[in-house]
Curated annotation (Swiss-Prot):
A GO-annotated cellular component: plasma membrane
Gene Ontology BP annotations: lipid catabolic process
UniProt note on regulation of activity: Inhibited by high concentrations of paraoxon. Inhibited by tetrahydrolipstatin (THL), a specific lipase inhibitor.
Species of the source: Mycobacterium tuberculosis (strain ATCC 25618 / H37Rv)
Protein name: Phospholipase Culp4
Miscellaneous comment as given in the Swiss-Prot or TrEMBL entry: Circulating B cells able to spontaneously generate specific antibodies directed against Culp4 are detected during active tuberculosis and in some latent-tuberculosis cases.
Subcellular location(s) of the protein: Cell membrane; Secreted, Cell wall
Disulfide bonds: 47-117, 191-198
Signal peptide positions (record): 1-45
Site positions for Transition state stabilizer: 129
Keywords per UniProt: Cell membrane, Cell wall, Disulfide bond, Hydrolase, Membrane, Secreted, Serine esterase, Signal
Subunit and interaction comment: Homodimer.
Family from the record: Belongs to the cutinase family.
C-alpha cells in the first residue's frame, strides 16, 4: 500500500499548490463572463469600526470586484457600524504565482491597520483567485509561492471574520482548513452547487452566481462578528 502524503508535509503542500494553479487557470478562462464591477467607494477618514480587505477574482478591474462590492453593500445594510474597504492590489490574471503578490499586499495592509487602528475589526474576503490570496495570507507559509509577509501572531486578534467565495482550495485538499485552524470559527467558505472551481461540478454559471444570495449570507455571518 502506497502511503498518502500527510497534510503538513512538503509533498502535500506542493501538490495542493499545483492543483490550485490549474484551478485558477480555469477560472481565468471564465473571467470574460464577469460583469464589469463598480469600484468601491473610499473609506471615510479616520479609523472605521470595521474594514473589509477583499481580493477580487481573476480578470476583474482593480478594486473590490463584483462579489466584493455586493458583499460590502450588504454588510453595510446589516450593521450600523462604519465599514471601510481596501481592495487588495495584485494582477488578478492567469498566473497563479502572482497571487502571492496579493497575499503580500494584503498582509502588509492588515499589519498597518492593526498598528494604526487598533480598535478596527478586520474582515478578510476573496472571490475565486482572490480567495486563494486570502488562503495564502492566513495559512502557514508555503515554500516556493513567493509569500514573504506572514502575519505575526498578534494580528490574529484583529481579524474578526473571513468570507470566501468560490475558493479553489476546496478542490486542493482543503488548504486553508488544514493549515489555519485558529481561523476556522471565524470563516465562512461558500461554494455554489456545481461550481467547478470549488467543487467537482461543471456549471460555470455557478461560479458567476454568488450575488446576491451568498454575498448576503456571508454579510449576515460577518455582521454578527464585528
Amino acid at each position: 500500500m502506497i502511503p498518502r502524503p500527510q497534510p503538513h508535509s512538503g509533498r502535500w503542500r506542493a501538490g495542493a499548490a499545483r492543483r490550485l494553479t490549474s484551478l485558477v487557470a480555469a477560472a481565468f478562462a471564465a473571467a470574460t463572463l464577469l460583469l464589469t464591477p463598480a469600484l468601491a467607494p473610499p473609506a471615510s477618514a479616520g479609523c472605521p469600526d470595521a474594514e473589509v480587505v477583499f481580493a477580487r477574482g481573476t480578470g476583474e478591474p482593480p478594486g473590490l470586484g463584483r462579489v466584493g462590492q455586493a458583499f460590502v453593500s450588504s454588510l453595510r445594510q446589516q450593521t450600523n457600524k462604519s465599514i471601510g474597504t481596501y481592495g487588495v492590489n495584485y494582477p488578478a490574471n492567469g498566473d497563479f504565482l502572482a497571487a502571492a503578490d496579493g497575499a503580500n499586499d494584503a498582509s502588509d495592509h492588515i499589519q498597518q491597520m492593526a498598528s494604526a487602528c487598533r480598535a478596527t475589526r478586520l474582515v478578510l474576503g476573496g472571490y475565486s483567485q482572490g480567495a486563494a490570496v486570502i488562503d495564502i495570507v492566513t495559512a502557514a507559509p508555503l515554500p516556493g509561492l513567493g509569500f514573504t509577509q506572514p502575519l505575526p501572531p498578534a494580528a490574529d486578534d484583529h481579524i474578526a471574520a473571513i468570507a470566501l467565495f468560490g475558493n479553489p482550495s476546496g478542490r486542493a485538499g482543503g488548504l486553508m482548513s488544514a493549515l489555519t485552524p485558529q481561523f476556522g470559527s471565524k470563516t465562512i467558505n461558500l461554494c455554489n452547487n456545481g461550481d467547478p472551481i470549488c467543487s467537482d461540478g461543471n456549471r460555470w454559471r455557478a461560479h458567476l452566481g454568488y450575488v446576491p444570495g451568498m454575498t448576503n449570507q456571508a454579510a449576515r455571518f460577518v455582521a454578527s462578528r464585528i
